[in-house]
Amino acid sequence: MKEDIAVKVQKQLFELQDLKYRDFHAKLMPTIDKEKVIGVRTPALRSYAKQFGKTEEAKEFMKVLPHKYYEENNLHGMLLEQIKDYDELIIELEKFLPYIDNWATCDLLSLRIVKKNLEDFLEKINKYIKSDQPYTIRFGISMLMKHYLDDNFKIEYANKVAAVQSEEYYVNMMRAWYFATALAKQYDSIIPFIEEKKLDVWTHNKACLLYTSPS
C-alpha cells in the first residue's frame, strides 16, 4: 500500500513536469542530484497539494519516508502546512525533519499554526538548533526568523542564533539571514551584535551584505 501510493504520486507529479524549469531550478540546489528533481513549478505543486491533502492517501504518502524526489519532499512539507492540530503537526514534523536534504525544502516550511503555540514551539526550536542535522538546525533558525522577530521578539532568541556553531554553509547562511532580517525589524536590539562584533567574521559580513536598511 505504501509503495503503491508513492508510485502513484510520482506518476502524477511527472504529469506536471516542466523540463526547462527543472534544469534551471536544479542548479540552485547543488546538494541535490538533478535526477532527483522532477521539475514541478511551485504554484502547480501547491495546487496539487491542496487537492491531494483532502484525501486519505495523503496520510499514507506521509508515511513513505524517505521520499525519492525533491518534489515529494516539498509536497510533504505542503501537507504538513495543512495539519490543523498542533500536537499532530509536531509529531509529523519531527518524523520529516531528518529527511530534509536541501535549503529549498527547509525554507518552504512556515507552519502558521505555530503562531497559536509560540511558547511551546520555542521549546521545540531549542531542541532543533542543537541537532546534529544541518537542515534541522536551519529550520529552527528559520522559525525564529519567521515567528519571533516582531511583537514576540526577545534578545535571548538572537543570542541563541549567535551561539550556533557550525561549519555547514546552509546553517551559517540562515544565521546571516536571521541577523539581516533582525536588523530590519529590531535594529536597536540587534545592532550591538554588529558593532561589537559578536558574530563570527563570515556571518557578520554576510549579514551586513544582506541587510537592507528600513530607512
Give the positions of each predicted feature:
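Extended alpha-helical scaffolding segments
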Residues: 167-197, 201-203, 207
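Alpha-solenoid helical repeat architecture
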Residues: 65-66, 97-98, 129-130, 164-165, ...
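Short inter-helical turns and helix N-cap capping residues of alpha-solenoid HEAT/ARM repeat scaffolds
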Residues: 68-69, 102, 132-133, 167-169, ...
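Conserved small/polar residues in nucleotide/adenosyl-binding loops
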Residues: 211-215
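Non-membrane alpha-helical segments in proteins
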Residues: 43, 47, 70-83, 96, ...
